[in-house]
Amino acid sequence: MATADHEATGLDCDHAIRRLLRRIDAHIADEPRDSPVRRYLERELGGREGTEADTRLVVHAQINVVRELFERRSDADGLRLLSNIERECC
């Protein structure tokens, strides 16, 4: 269900953020264990026991690192999803 302020766009922010986190997890798993980006994102995004709003804040705070990860992985779909989330959800 989209939040009230995002109903006009049709983007379900909570669902989009869950999709984004799955993409991040997949890319992190492919990064070398000693990758600074991997270690950083595992530390910052590792604990997701909070609410959807908490997760949204964490993603927003790490948006540039996530963008860097997607760029390094040439993930155009991930970058597009990230941009939509940044524009409509954060």
UniProtKB/Swiss-Prot annotation:
Organism: Halorhodospira halophila (strain DSM 244 / SL1) (Ectothiorhodospira halophila (strain DSM 244 / SL1))
Organism domain of life: Bacteria
Family according to the record: Belongs to the CowN family.
Alphabetical UniProt keywords: Nitrogen fixation
Pfam families: CowN
Record GO biological process: nitrogen fixation
Function of the molecule: Is required to sustain N(2)-dependent growth in the presence of low levels of carbon monoxide (CO). Probably acts by protecting the N(2) fixation ability of the nitrogenase complex, which is inactivated in the presence of CO.
Annotated InterPro entries: CowN (IPR024899)
Name used for this protein in its record: N(2)-fixation sustaining protein CowN
